[in-house]
Amino acid sequence: MFTINAEVRKEQGKGASRRLRAANKFPAIIYGGSEAPIAIELDHDQVMNMQAKAEFYSEVLTLVVDGKEVKVKAQAVQRHAYKPKLTHIDFVRA
């Protein structure tokens, strides 16, 4: 099983997302279930290594958001058009 460390995003919008990507992070969101959606930021290199395995897309993942574990599945993954970079991931609560 995969465990990914995440932080709640303090800023949102295009400029904030670009600053995240320049800092080797990228935005993501957790939604679904009865709880409200959570905008998070992830470390690019950590997730890039994990997503190379097929299990990343089919198994339940554990996101540690501010010390609290959230069980999720990767719903949608957006990649850069020509660079080997992730730009956004949607996670749905499992």
Curated annotation (Swiss-Prot):
Domain of life: Bacteria
InterPro entries: Rbsml_bL25/Gln-tRNA_synth_N, Ribosomal_bL25/Gln-tRNA_synth, Ribosomal_bL25_short, Ribosomal_L25_dom, Ribosomal_uL5_bac-type
GO cellular component, one term: cytosolic large ribosomal subunit
Gene3D superfamilies for the chain: Ribosomal Protein L25, Chain P
Pfam families: Ribosomal_L25p
MF (Gene Ontology): 5S rRNA binding; structural constituent of ribosome
Record bears the keyword Ribosomal protein: yes
Keywords recorded for this protein, A-Z: Ribonucleoprotein, Ribosomal protein, RNA-binding, rRNA-binding
SUPFAM superfamilies: Ribosomal protein L25-like
GO biological process annotation, one example: translation
Family listed: Belongs to the bacterial ribosomal protein bL25 family.
Quaternary structure, from the entry: Part of the 50S ribosomal subunit; part of the 5S rRNA/L5/L18/L25 subcomplex. Contacts the 5S rRNA. Binds to the 5S rRNA independently of L5 and L18.
Role played: This is one of the proteins that binds to the 5S RNA in the ribosome where it forms part of the central protuberance.
UniProt-listed PANTHER family: RIBOSOMAL PROTEIN L25/GLN-TRNA SYNTHETASE, ANTI-CODON-BINDING DOMAIN-CONTAINING PROTEIN (PTHR33284), RIBOSOMAL PROTEIN L25_GLN-TRNA SYNTHETASE, ANTI-CODON-BINDING DOMAIN-CONTAINING PROTEIN (PTHR33284:SF1)
Stated name of the protein: Large ribosomal subunit protein bL25
Organism of this sequence: Salmonella typhimurium (strain LT2 / SGSC1412 / ATCC 700720)
